[in-house]
Curated annotation (Swiss-Prot):
HAMAP family documented for this protein: HMG_CoA_synth_arch
Species lineage: Archaea, Methanobacteriati, Methanobacteriota, Methanomada group, Methanococci
Residues annotated for (3S)-3-hydroxy-3-methylglutaryl-CoA binding in this entry: 30-31, 114, 155, 205, 238, 270, 300
Protein name listed in UniProt: Hydroxymethylglutaryl-CoA synthase
Biological or metabolic pathway of the protein: Metabolic intermediate biosynthesis; (R)-mevalonate biosynthesis; (R)-mevalonate from acetyl-CoA: step 2/3
Species name: Methanococcus maripaludis (strain DSM 14266 / JCM 13030 / NBRC 101832 / S2 / LL)
Domain of life, per lineage: Archaea
EC number: 2.3.3.10
Gene Ontology molecular function terms on file: acetyl-CoA C-acetyltransferase activity; hydroxymethylglutaryl-CoA synthase activity
SUPFAM superfamilies the record matches: Thiolase-like
Gene3D superfamilies reported in the protein's UniProt record: 3.40.47.10
Pfam families in alphabetical order: ACP_syn_III_C (PF08541)
PANTHER family reported in the protein's UniProt record: 3-HYDROXY-3-METHYLGLUTARYL COENZYME A SYNTHASE, HYDROXYMETHYLGLUTARYL-COA SYNTHASE
Family listed: Belongs to the thiolase-like superfamily. Archaeal HMG-CoA synthase family.
């Protein structure tokens, strides 16, 4: 199988934010205790004209801009999300049409809770590495929902990132050294058809779910590559909240210098399928040639995908071709709880 790498990437975030204090105030909760417990200060809120498709399209267009390739050369488009706008009508087709990819390509919408985006990256790696196509695109994006008053309401956010995978070494922004996955049947978080909001197992979502899969996924990747945390310059993990992320990073031996760029949850919330892709995009925005990145996603149900990535010198040529994730984070406008309820369609008659 041929070596494959990232040849283009892009991200997108809504500009609206709501502070933890506004949510807590509406429910008579202690905002400071919640912020300390979750390590989340505020989260993104999609506007009334934003959904997973619009976020995916904008991310994909930015990825194409950085890649500098003809969109017609892309042979596959995958969009991973648990908040696709339609139950029956592919988001991937919308993205491809908006980006000028169609009609000569294959597409699919993916679901695996919060790791659907990284599952798409693995599929693209296989298709390009086997020489079935020249390029493939994977997007991870979500506009997540939490029931009013539930703990998820402080974290369920919106955002996404796209990655174009290719096999021409001279086009690599970053090279994949390897990937590894760890998957079980663990019912920590779920939502049935026709239900508006997901249910979760509370504390059960920690040790037997998130930590078991992220830590085993990470250890499996390191064993496969013969590495330790000291061999990497940066890392990013799935981040349902800041506390879980920091705990996982420290258990694996990573330092603040290694994990700081991947950690976006305190300022953004949990963007679900977009969480690890956004963290990786922010790392790439700050990385330099030969930096090595360790990536582990997590999707409830449950599974983790891990990646070992090395950045190339081409990164310096493409970063400034599009807006960075950090700049998107800085472009924000706060809304109160009433506007948040309106924008998220939570006021039901």
């Amino acid at each position: 199988m041929k070596e494959v790498g990232i040849v283009g990437y892009g991200s997108d975030l809504p500009k609206y934010r709501i502070k933890a204090e506004d949510i807590a105030g509406a429910w008579g909760k202690d905002a400071q205790a919640i912020k300390r417990g979750l390590v989340v200060n505020e989260k993104s809120v999609p506007g009334p004209d934003e959904d997973t498709a619009t976020i995916a399209v904008q991310s994909a267009r930015r990825a194409l801009s950085r890649a500098g390739i003809n969109p017609k050369d892309i042979g596959a488009v995958y969009v991973g999300s648990e908040s696709h706008p339609y139950a029956v009508k592919p988001t991937s087709g919308i993205v491809a049409e908006a980006c000028g990819v169609s009609p000569d390509f294959t597409a699919a919408d993916l679901e695996f809770a919060c790791k659907a985006g990284t599952a798409g990256i693995q599929m693209c790696m296989g298709l390009v590495g086997s020489e079935m196509m020249e390029y493939a695109m994977a997007v991870g994006a979500d506009t997540a929902q939490g029931a009013p008053g539930d703990a998820l309401e402080y974290t369920a956010a919106a955002g996404g990132a796209a990655f174009i995978i290719g096999a021409k070494k001279e086009e690599f922004i970053a090279k994949f050294n390897g990937t590894y996955s760890y998957t079980t049947d663990t019912p920590d978080f779920w939502r049935r058809e026709h239900e508006h909001y997901p249910k979760h197992g509370g504390r059960f979502t920690g040790e037997p779910a998130y930590f078991k899969h992220v830590l085993n996924g990470a250890k499996g990747m390191m064993e496969k590559m013969g590495t330790t945390s000291k061999d990497y310059d940066y890392c990013v993990f799935h981040q349902p909240n800041g506390k879980f992320y920091l705990t996982a990073a420290k258990k694996l031996g990573f330092t603040e210098e290694q994990y700081k760029y991947g950690l976006l949850t305190p300022y953004l919330g949990n963007t679900y399928s977009g969480a690890v892709p956004l963290g990786l995009s922010n790392i790439l925005d700050h990385a330099k040639a030969d930096d090595r990145i360790f990536v582990v996603s997590y999707g409830s149900g449950a599974g983790s995908d891990a990646f070992d990535i090395t950045v190339t010198d081409r990164i310096s040529e493409v970063v400034d071709k599009e807006i960075t994730t950090e700049k998107l984070l800085e472009q924000k406008k706060y809304v109160d709880y009433a506007v948040y309820l309106k924008y998220r369609g939570k006021i039901r008659m």
